[in-house]
Amino acid sequence: MVKRLKELLSPIIGVDAAASVIASYDVIGDIAIIKVPEQAFEYRQAVGSAIMNDNKSIKSVWAQVSPVQGEYRLRELANIAGEDRSVTVHRESGCIFSLDVREVYFSPRLSHERERIASLVGEGERVFNMFAGVGAFSIVIAKRVNNVKVYSAEINEAAYRYMLMNIEQNKLKSTVIPILDDARNVAARLRHGVDRVLMPLPERAMEYYEDAIASLDGGGWIHLYLHVKRIRSEDIIYSAKDKLKPYGGSVESYRIVREVGPSTLQLVFDIKFNSI
């Protein structure tokens, strides 16, 4: 994808400008989102057109013009090619997700992680997704595993509305339980009531870690997502174990989910609690 896009752009905007373009882009449904560096922003329409020419399934291209930020983890987007439309339908793992890329946070780059988590959930488990968004983790789990309940908390009203829609269109109304409230309040109501907790909000997960522990029913699993500096793998696990030691539990495994910057990684730690 990277080489192909740069090759398409070089004769249009020049080799130097093409080289500066971050050529990996996210595809969400029929929408593409790309980061266009400042030095190449004047060529943004050419970048958008090149993406659409390279991928005929894409109907709209947006440039990300701000980092992911704020309580709802949103990013400012500017339409640079195709339809001026931000609502789409994304298909993944046999599931359907309706969403507005300007109103909610959604990353297609987490698709493999969603599948991995679903593969770990056992039949009959009670799962608490503390930061559910449009319901992606919750719905993939509920589609894959029999007889589960997935309590799904979200504070962004737009994301919550799309979660309701996605639960309906994936026919999971009795399995995924949507809750419009802060995860801390939901954790208090679910106290000692679940077997597994998902914490896919790296920026703030540690603020809610004690609440996650308190929601476990005598033991279970927490999947904790964090942003960490890129260091040696043995130093990562040592630092994590040292940070989490006061809370109990055992870090059974960890993995790199994705790169989020030149020096930052998103990691997930699979933590087991034998008793609370």
Tell what function each PLM region has.
Residues 1-276:
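SAM-dependent transferase fold signal centered on methyltransferase-like domains
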